[in-house]
Regions:
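Short amphipathic alpha-helical segments, especially helix-boundary/capping motifs
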Residues: 18-20, 66-67
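Beta-strand/beta-sandwich contexts
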Residues: 20-51, 99-109
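Short non-domain terminal segments
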Residues: 9, 28-30, 92
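Residue-identity detector for threonine
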Residues: 16-17, 33, 93-95
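Positively charged n-region of N-terminal signal peptides that target proteins for export
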Residues: 1-4
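Bacterial N-terminal signal peptides
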Residues: 7-16
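Immunoglobulin-like IPT/TIG beta-sandwich domains and homologous Ig-like subdomains
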Residues: 37-97
Length: 109
C-alpha cells in the first residue's frame, strides 16, 4: 500500500511540474543586431522553466549553452549572433517532455 501511495504521489507531482511550465519574463527584453560582442545571455524566468530544454531556429543565431540554476524557475540561455543576423522575431522553443512552449524574442536593428 505504501508503494502504491508513493507511486501515485510521484505521478501527481510529475503532472503538476509538467503542466506548470510558463515564461513570465526574459531579460533583456530585446537585443540589437550588429553589436561588437556576438554573445547574448538571456535570463528566462517562469514557473518550472528550469526543467526545459531549449532550441533556437533562426538564421545567424546559434545556441551556445543553457545553464540551469538552483531555482527551478530560472534558466540562463547563451546565444551566439553572427554579424549577418537580421532583425526580426526569433522563436525560442522550450520543451519539457512532449510539451513545447515557443516564445518570440525580438532582435532590433
Amino acid at each position: 500500500m505504501k508503494k502504491l501511495l508513493l507511486l501515485l504521489g510521484s505521478f501527481l507531482l510529475s503532472l503538476t511540474t509538467y503542466a506548470a511550465m510558463n515564461i513570465s519574463k526574459i531579460d533583456p527584453p530585446f537585443w540589437f543586431t550588429g553589436m561588437n560582442n556576438p554573445e547574448l545571455q538571456l535570463m528566462v524566468y517562469g514557473e518550472g522553466i528550469g526543467q526545459a530544454s531549449v532550441s533556437v531556429n533562426y538564421p545567424g543565431v546559434s545556441l551556445s549553452s543553457v545553464v540551469k540554476l538552483e531555482s527551478n524557475n530560472y534558466l540562463l540561455v547563451y546565444l551566439h549572433l553572427d554579424k549577418e543576423v537580421k532583425p526580426g522575431k526569433m522563436p525560442i522553443t522550450f520543451t519539457v517532455g512532449k510539451k513545447k512552449l515557443v516564445k518570440e524574442y525580438e532582435l532590433k536593428a
